[in-house]
C-alpha cells in the first residue's frame, strides 16, 4: 500500500536526507528556517516532513489556487503547457513574514527537467535576497534537470546550496544523491 511504502521510505530517507544535506544547512537555526514545498503525488511532501523532523523550522506546502489534474497524463500535459508559456499559477499559500527566514529548504518534483511553475510563482512572490536556498528534488530519473539554473535566475541574490536529489520509481524505495552545485 502507499502508506506502507511511505513509512518504509521514511525510515530509509531519515538518515539519508539529513546526512546528504550541506553542513551549513544542517546547522540552520530552526526559528529562522522555512521548509516550503510543492507536491503533486505526495513524494515531495514525504521528503519535506522528514527534513522538518531533522531540522525543525516552519513547514509549508505551496498550493496553487487551481490544482493540477489528478490524472497523471493530464497533469503532464498541463505542466508542459505551463512551462512553455512560463505560466505563474496563483498560489493560495501565503507566507506571513518571509523576512524572518534565513534558510529556505525548497522542495519540488522535477517537471520537464526544471521547476514546476508554482515554484516559480513562489520565488517571484517573495524577496529571497541574502537567503540560503536548499533545494530538494523528487524525480523519476531526471535528477535535477535544469532546476538549479531556473532557481538561480529567479533568485540571483541568494545563496543556493547543493541540492538533495531523490529518485522514486514505482514500488521501490527512494534513493538519493547530492546535486552538482
Predicted feature residues:
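N-terminal secretory signal peptides and thylakoid transit peptides that target proteins
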Residues: 1-13
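Hydrophobic h-region of N-terminal signal peptides that target proteins for export
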Residues: 14-19
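FMN-binding flavodoxin-like domain, especially the glycine-rich phosphate-binding loop
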Residues: 28-70, 77-78, 83-181
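Boundary at the C-terminal end of the N-terminal hydrophobic targeting segment
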Residues: 22-27
